[in-house]
C-alpha cells in the first residue's frame, strides 16, 4: 500500500512484513491508520513491534538486495545512517535540501548501505523521489518477505587484514559500535557481486527473545562484549586458553644466565667459599702466575689458545707501563713531595701542630746524628731558634743558634748550600717546644727562598720541624745534648734577658713588615 504525498519536512519510514503466503505483498506499511490518526511514528513503532521479523525473533533469514534496486539514498542525518530515530529537517531547509542535496561522504561505510531498505538506495534515480518506495514483487521473487539487515559487528584488526585482500574494500571505514550487539548480523553481502554472500563471521546463537518480550532492540552495548564469537579469536590465541598447563623439565643450571660469560655456560659453578684470585693488574709484572684451569672448563677455552693469549697481552700492557709516568702521578700526593716536587721526603714524618709543616720525631734526629743517612745527605743543618741564654743552658750537638729571622736569612740564603752527587741538603728547625718560634722560622725561610728562585726551584726544598722541641729531645736523647742540661725560657735567673730579646724580636718584626711593604711597592 502506497501512502499519499506529504510535505518534504515530514519523513516516513515504511517497513514490510510479509507472512508465509507468497500472495501477499512483499512490503507492508509499518504505520497504518493509527499513525494518521495522531500517533507519532515512534509510538506506532512500539505498538507494532511484534509484527516485525528479525528483531528479537527466533529465526533469521538472509537478505539479498540487488545493486540496481530502485531504493535511493539521499542526504540524511547521522541517525538515518544508523537506521534508527529518523530526524526531520526544518521547513525552511526542505526546499534547499531537495534542490541541492548534500550527501555525507564518510558517515557510513559502503558495506552498511544494504543494512535496511531505508539505507540501500540507487544513486541513479531522481533526487526528488520519495524517501521510501514499495518494492515491486516482480523484482523480488526470490524474497517473499524481507527483514532489516542487522549492522555488521565491528571488525578486529586481524580480520580486517585477512578479509581486506579478498574483498578489495577499505574495511577501516566501518563505523564502530553503530548499533547494539543484538542487532548485528551473521552474514554480509558484497555489494559489487549481487547474489553472493561473503561470511565475515560465522553465525552465532545469541540470547533469543520471544515475541512477548518487551525488548525494543536497543540493548546495552555491554551485552555484545559477552557474546563474542569464538571464531574471531585466532587459533593460536585460543590454544593459550584451552591448552593444558605443561611443566618444563629443562635443567635450569645448564642454561646461560643473563650476565654470565658465554664461555662459562657449560662449566661447573665455582665454590663460593673459595678465595677470589687476584687480578693480574694488581700483581707485579715479574710475579705473574698462570691461572689454574678449572676441572670443568669448556673445551672451547682449551682449544683456543690464541684468544687467551690476546687477553693476557692486553692485561700486561697496563702492568708493564713505567711506574714513573703513571703511578707517580696518580699515587703520589703533592703534599708528600718536597718543595720543588722533584722527589719525596727522606724521613718518616709525624703529625704536628701545624699541618702545613713536616715534623720528625726525636728518634729520627738521633739516627741522623749517628750517621745512618750519611750516604744520602750532604749537609744536615739544625737551626736552634731559642734565645741565647737557652742555647747556652743546653742544645743538640751541631745545632746553630739563630733566633732572629734576619740572621737565618743571612746564614742560609746569602750563601746557599748546593747539593752534589744527588745527595740532599736538609734543614731542621726547633725551639723549646717547637710550637711558635721554630715553625715561624721555617715558614720564613721557605718564603724568602721562593722569592729568590723561579717556581718551583728552591735552595732548600726539604725542611723539617723537630716535634716536641728541645725539651722532648732532651728527655729522650740526652746523650746527644751539649751540655747535657735543659734551661727553660721562663727561668727566674734570666728574666731581664727574656725582656731584652723579646723587645728586640718585636722591634725587628715591625721593621720587617715595613721592609716587606717597601719591597712589594718597588716591584709594582
Swiss-Prot record:
Domain of life of the native organism: Eukaryota
What chemistry does it catalyse, as a reaction equation? O-phospho-L-tyrosyl-[protein] + H2O = L-tyrosyl-[protein] + phosphate
Q: Where is this motif: KEN box?
A: 141-143
Q: What are the GO BP annotations of this UniProt entry?
A: cell division; cell population proliferation; G1/S transition of mitotic cell cycle; G2/M transition of mitotic cell cycle; positive regulation of DNA replication; positive regulation of G2/M transition of mitotic cell cycle; positive regulation of G2/MI transition of meiotic cell cycle; regulation of cyclin-dependent protein serine/threonine kinase activity
**Phosphothreonine PTM sites in chain numbering:** 507
Question: Where does the record place the Rhodanese domain?
Answer: 376-482
Per the record, the gene is CDC25A
- Indicate the family of this protein: Belongs to the MPI phosphatase family.
User: Would you tell me the protein name for this molecule?
Assistant: M-phase inducer phosphatase 1
Mark the transmembrane ranges. Answer: none
Q: Per its UniProt record, what InterPro entries does this chain match? A: MPI_Phosphatase (IPR000751), Rhodanese-like_dom (IPR001763), Rhodanese-like_dom_sf (IPR036873)
GO MF, one term, reads: phosphoprotein phosphatase activity
Please provide an example of a Pfam family that matches this protein in its UniProt record: M-inducer_phosp
Q: Active-site positions, per UniProt?
A: 431
Q: What, per the annotation, is the impact of changing residue 81 to A?
A: Abrogates interactions with BTRC and FBXW11 and prevents ubiquitination
Q: Where is the composition biased (Basic and acidic residues)?
A: 303-312
Q: Which UniProt keywords apply?
A: Cell cycle, Cell division, Hydrolase, Mitosis, Phosphoprotein, Protein phosphatase, Ubl conjugation
Q: How is its activity regulated?
A: Stimulated by B-type cyclins. Stimulated by PIM1-mediated phosphorylation.
What the protein does comes down to:
Tyrosine protein phosphatase which functions as a dosage-dependent inducer of mitotic progression. Directly dephosphorylates CDK1 and stimulates its kinase activity. Also dephosphorylates CDK2 in complex with cyclin-E, in vitro.
PTM summary: Phosphorylated by CHEK1 on Ser-76, Ser-124, Ser-178, Ser-279, Ser-293 and Thr-507 during checkpoint mediated cell cycle arrest. Also phosphorylated by CHEK2 on Ser-124, Ser-279, and Ser-293 during checkpoint mediated cell cycle arrest. Phosphorylation on Ser-178 and Thr-507 creates binding sites for YWHAE/14-3-3 epsilon which inhibits CDC25A. Phosphorylation on Ser-76, Ser-124, Ser-178, Ser-279 and Ser-293 may also promote ubiquitin-dependent proteolysis of CDC25A by the SCF complex. Ubiquitinated by the anaphase promoting complex/cyclosome (APC/C) ubiquitin ligase complex that contains FZR1/CDH1 during G1 phase leading to its degradation by the proteasome. Ubiquitinated by a SCF complex containing BTRC and FBXW11 during S phase leading to its degradation by the proteasome. Deubiquitination by USP17L2/DUB3 leads to its stabilization.
Q: Which organism is it from?
A: Homo sapiens
Q: What GO CC terms are in its UniProt record?
A: cytoplasm; cytosol; nucleoplasm; nucleus
- Disordered: region residues: 264-317
Q: How does this chain assemble?
A: Interacts with CCNB1/cyclin B1. Interacts with YWHAE/14-3-3 epsilon when phosphorylated. Interacts with CUL1 specifically when CUL1 is neddylated and active. Interacts with BTRC/BTRCP1 and FBXW11/BTRCP2. Interactions with CUL1, BTRC and FBXW11 are enhanced upon DNA damage. Interacts with CHEK2; mediates CDC25A phosphorylation and degradation in response to infrared-induced DNA damages. Interacts with HSP90AB1; prevents heat shock-mediated CDC25A degradation and contributes to cell cycle progression.
Q: Does the keyword Cell division apply?
A: yes
Amino acid at each position: 500500500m502506497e501512502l499519499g504525498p506529504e510535505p518534504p519536512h515530514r519523513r516516513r519510514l515504511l517497513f514490510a512484513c510479509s507472512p508465509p503466503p507468497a500472495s501477499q505483498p512483499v512490503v507492508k506499511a509499518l504505520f497504518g491508520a493509527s499513525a494518521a490518526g495522531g500517533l507519532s511514528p515512534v509510538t506506532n513503532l512500539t505498538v507494532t513491534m511484534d509484527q516485525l521479523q528479525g528483531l528479537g525473533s527466533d529465526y533469521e533469514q538472509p537478505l539479498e538486495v540487488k545493486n540496481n534496486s530502485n531504493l535511493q539514498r539521499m542526504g540524511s542525518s547521522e541517525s538515518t545512517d544508523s537506521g534508527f530515530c529518523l530526524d526531520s529537517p526544518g521547513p525552511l531547509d526542505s526546499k534547499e535540501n531537495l534542490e541541492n542535496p548534500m550527501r555525507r561522504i564518510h558517515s557510513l561505510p559502503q558495506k552498511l548501505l544494504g543494512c535496511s531498505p531505508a539505507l540501500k538506495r540507487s544513486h541513479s534515480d531522481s533526487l526528488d523521489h520519495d524517501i521510501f518506495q514499495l518494492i515491486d514483487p516482480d523484482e523480488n521473487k526470490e524474497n517473499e518477505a524481507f527483514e532489516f539487515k542487522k549492522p555488521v559487528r565491528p571488525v578486529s584488526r586481524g580480520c580486517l587484514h585477512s578479509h581486506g585482500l579478498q574483498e578489495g574494500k577499505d574495511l577501516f571505514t566501518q563505523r564502530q559500535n553503530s548499533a547494539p550487539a543484538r542487532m548485528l548480523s551473521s552474514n554480509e553481502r558484497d555489494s559489487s557481486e549481487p547474489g553472493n554472500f561473503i561470511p565475515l563471521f560465522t553465525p552465532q546463537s545469541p540470547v533469543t527473545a520471544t515475541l512477548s518480550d518487551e525488548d525494543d532492540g536497543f540493548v546495552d552495548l555491554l551485552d555484545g562484549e559477552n557474546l563474542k564469537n569464538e571464531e574471531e579469536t585466532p587459533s593460536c590465541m585460543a590454544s593459550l586458553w584451552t591448552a593444558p598447563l605443561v611443566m618444563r623439565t629443562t635443567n635450569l643450571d645448564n642454561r646461560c644466565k643473563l650476565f654470565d660469560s658465554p664461555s662459562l655456560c657449560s662449566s661447573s659453578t665455582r665454590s663460593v667459599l673459595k678465595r677470589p684470585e687476584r687480578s693480574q693488574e694488581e700483581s707485579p709484572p715479574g710475579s705473574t702466575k698462570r691461572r689454574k684451569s678449572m676441572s670443568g672448563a669448556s673445551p672451547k677455552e682449551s682449544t683456543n689458545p690464541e684468544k687467551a693469549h690476546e687477553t693476557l697481552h692486553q692485561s700486561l700492557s697496563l702492568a708493564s707501563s713505567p711506574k714513573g709516568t703513571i703511578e707517580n702521578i696518580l699515587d703520589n700526593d703533592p703534599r708528600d713531595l718536597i718543595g720543588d716536587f722533584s722527589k719525596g721526603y727522606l724521613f718518616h714524618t709525624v703529625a704536628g701542630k701545624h699541618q702545613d709543616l713536616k715534623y720528625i720525631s726525636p728518634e729520627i734526629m738521633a739516627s741522623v746524628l749517628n750517621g745512618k743517612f750519611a750516604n744520602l745527605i750532604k749537609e744536615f743543618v739544625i737551626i736552634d731558634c731559642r734565645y741565647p741564654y737557652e742555647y747556652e743552658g743546653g742544645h743538640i750537638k751541631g745545632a746553630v743558634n739563630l733566633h732572629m729571622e734576619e740572621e737565618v736569612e743571612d746564614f742560609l740564603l746569602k750563601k746557599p748550600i748546593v747539593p752534589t752527587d744527588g745527595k740532599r741538603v736538609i734543614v731542621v728547625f726547633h725551639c723549646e717546644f717547637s710550637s711558635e718560634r721554630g715553625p715561624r722560622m721555617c715558614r720564613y725561610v721557605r718564603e724568602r727562598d721562593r722569592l729568590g728562585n723561579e717556581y718551583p726551584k728552591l735552595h732548600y726544598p726539604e725542611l723539617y720541624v723537630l716535634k716536641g722541641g728541645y725539651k722532648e729531645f732532651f728527655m729522650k736523647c740526652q746523650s746527644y745534648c751539649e751540655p747535657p742540661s735543659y734551661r727553660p725560657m721562663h727561668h727566674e735567673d734570666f728574666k731581664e734577658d727574656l725582656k731584652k730579646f723579646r723587645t728586640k724580636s718585636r722591634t725587628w718584626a715591625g721593621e720587617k713588615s715595613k721592609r716587606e711593604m717597601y719591597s712589594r711597592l718597588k716591584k709594582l
